[in-house]
Amino acid sequence: MANQKIRIRLKAYEHRVLDESADKIVESAKRTGAQVSGPIPLPTERTLYTVIRSPHKFKKSREQFEMRTHKRLIDIIDPTPKTVDALMKLDLPSGVDIEIKL
């Protein structure tokens, strides 16, 4: 797999779980002899929801909820077949969304 790059984007609502997953990926890639760039923190997405507190009236009384999506980017440069196998066998938490591009 010469001159190839694997780009991994991680998304999660909790940044601690996200950082632990990124560390696991970087550690397993370095252990198999690949060069790793990252984890690079990407901008956090902040979604704000405003709802009326009461079911019928009092429109001035509102409540706001926010949802933050934390993101990280990891580039694995010149991966070996061992690197790909190690990444496939890696067990990561279910709260982390993983997007892999070759």
UniProtKB/Swiss-Prot annotation:
GO terms for cellular component: ribonucleoprotein complex; ribosome. It holds the Pfam family Ribosomal_S10. Keywords: Ribonucleoprotein, Ribosomal protein. The keyword rRNA-binding does not apply. It comes from the Bacteria. Transmembrane segments: none annotated. One of its GO terms (biological process) is translation. One of its GO terms (molecular function) is structural constituent of ribosome. Involved in the binding of tRNA to the ribosomes. Belongs to the universal ribosomal protein uS10 family. Part of the 30S ribosomal subunit. This is Small ribosomal subunit protein uS10. It comes from Limosilactobacillus fermentum (strain NBRC 3956 / LMG 18251). The lineage of its organism: Bacteria, Bacillati, Bacillota, Bacilli, Lactobacillales.
